[in-house]
Amino acid sequence: MQLIRQIPLLISVFWLSACAALVSVLIPLENVAKPTGEYQVGTQVIHMVDNDRSAWYGQESSNPREIMVRVWYPAQPQEGDLKAPYVYNEKLIGDMVSEGFGIPKYLMKNLRNINGNTWSEAHPVNEKFPVLIFSHGIGGLKTQNTTQMEEMASHGYVVFSCDHAYDAGVSIFPGDRIIFGKTNIPDNLTKEEKWNMRRAQLDYRAADIQFLLDEMDRENFLSVALKNSLDLEHIGVFGHSFGGGTSVVVASVDERIDACFGLDAWFLPIPSNVLNSDLNKPFIHLGQVSWKEKENYLKLDTLAGNNSAWSVRLDVRGATHYDFTDFSQFSKLTKKYGSGMIAPPRIRKITNSAIREFFDHYLKNGPALALETYEKLYPELIIKRY
């Protein structure tokens, strides 16, 4: 504990003495928490091309849409299988995170040392499991909620996540082709033009998820073994920030999706016709107590209030936007760069429990989410029923 209190002073000393590289030795990053389920977890990275859509609006629109997908699934590791890294291309990812959060780059050098709990290309368990699809926020990554991906796969789900190219912080394609995010809004646009731009991005994101769903029933990109492990009669979507809004939109238009979960979701870009319609699917939102944009949660309340299926809102005292990702899980220093006061193990437990029990009920016919029990177990929760 004494070292933790002295970290700001240590950083200043090392920085000023040009020995900043040593700080990464003094401040290691935590590994991904071990999942609690019965299954070991495999992972694969898949390059998919949608020839029916253009890459993005703008200069690249003449090329087909490409997305990089990562999948986590119940696995049977064999002798000789290797553990997968938390992220590939860790230096590039570390630099991107550093720039996005204002974190000194030398503090991200240990990103390569974060250990996950998955086996690369391990053979899938020979059973069928419900499918989940995750959507990241603006500037996010497909791996940003690896904690939840591994947890859900260990409990018998196949979890897909894609980099929404041009909207992700960075997408790395075969041949080391790199596409950085290009979705910043120009300052010279009117308010109406800005929201039209966001809705165009939202449409592309939702179409990415629908393309993923289409490909799960084909053999263009998925191995036969992985395809055979998919229970396509039970599908859920979840997402963080803009990805939460994306999940709502795609759930509202695609009958293949059975349930939807938002993690501190951004509702402002969602069209009014979606908010004012009946989602008619179970929906839960887990997020911070309030947003600076007060209208965000007003739109959440409109969506949930119009939903004829079960809806609930769980607000977490002491949490901020990035506590609902892996960001706060790897170092106490993240509290200096945007994570909240809630302890990392605590927000991890709340998030994992809510996601697992929600989808267990609606995709596996498990017990209903016991909100009265949640109120006792997690006094930091504010629960709103609709």
Set out the residue ranges of the language-model regions:
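The feature captures the conserved acid-bearing segment of alpha/beta-hydrolase catalytic domains
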Residues: D258-H321
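Alpha/beta-hydrolase active-site loop
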Residues: I172-S229
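Alpha/beta-hydrolase-fold serine-hydrolase catalytic core, especially in secreted/extracellular enzymes
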Residues: P28, A33-P35, Q40-G42, N51-D52, ...
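Short substrate-entry loop that stabilizes the transition state in hydrolases
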Residues: I114-F129, F134-I172, K292-K294
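Active-site machinery of serine-nucleophile hydrolases
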Residues: W72-G80, P85-M96, G100-G102, T143-L189, ...
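Domain-level recognition of soluble alpha/beta enzyme cores
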Residues: V23-L132, P344, I355
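Primarily recognizes the serine-hydrolase "nucleophile elbow" in alpha/beta-hydrolase
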Residues: L212-S277
